[in-house]
Amino acid sequence: MPLKVDLNADMGESFGAYKLGLDRELLNLVTSANIACGFHAGDYMVMQKTVNMAASKNVAVGAHPGFPDLQGFGRRNMQLSPEEVRNLVIYQIGALQPFARAEGTELKHVKPHGALYNMAAVNYELAKAIAEAVKKTVPDAILLALANSEMVKAANDVGIRVTQEVFADRAYNEDGTLVPRSMPGAVIDDPLQATERALEMVLEGKVTAINGKEIPIVAHSICVHGDNPKAVELASSIRKQLEKAHVEVVELTYVLKAAYS
């Protein structure tokens, strides 16, 4: 059976007069779209438009909840209790879900954004709060979680489906976490380098950390950040080379079926 992997991108991150990302172009390349829900980015007009575009391209629609931090784009840590995190995720899923249904689709997955994602990757209680929010609102949806993280453990404990995500356009620490964006070399915008890393993770099950050490990794889904100026080039190159290597690029549901069949 050929390998299968999902290709996802964060999108719907414009709001009001502010435009961000190349959503329309990316939707021709990705299989899953993580759509901002109004807290770190996005608004009701952008949410509807992005869901509509994704549904028309048969791209899986997912919620991308973040901290309530428009000014910081959800990339600044906030000290919230697990209960607060659970409820802010429920709130944002609830905001996006009707738009999906109005466009004839359903939320297929949930992926936390930015600082919320990174904090939950290493904090089990926050990770569990997110998993519980998914179970209470969209129990059939898949949690998209950093590979080998606390989110994967929490999802399994709570009893929801989970897929392990890797990043072609980000550098890794030795412990499998992402290098902070404030550090040199944290963001990768060279299509060749990003593609080589994606192939290494999918085909060889490993990634080279920023200190040169190889670490094992599980790659169910590859993320390309929509706000990366070279996102379209990266996604196009990655998809082309994956398919050349006989890897099927499909949405998360099919990746899970293949991984556990």
Curated annotation (Swiss-Prot):
Which molecular function term from Gene Ontology is one that the record holds?
Answer: ATP binding
Q: Which domain of life is it from?
A: Bacteria
Keywords of the record, alphabetical order, are: ATP-binding, Hydrolase, Nucleotide-binding
Tell me, what is an example of a GO biological process annotation in this record? carbohydrate metabolic process
Q: Which reaction does it catalyse?
A: 5-oxo-L-proline + ATP + 2 H2O = L-glutamate + ADP + phosphate + H(+)
* Enzyme Commission numbers on file: 3.5.2.9
Q: Which HAMAP family match?
A: PxpA (MF_00691)
User: What is its biological role?
Assistant: Catalyzes the cleavage of 5-oxoproline to form L-glutamate coupled to the hydrolysis of ATP to ADP and inorganic phosphate.
Q: Which family does it belong to?
A: Belongs to the LamB/PxpA family.
Question: Quaternary arrangement and interactors, per the entry?
Answer: Forms a complex composed of PxpA, PxpB and PxpC.
User: What name does UniProt use for this protein?
Assistant: 5-oxoprolinase subunit A
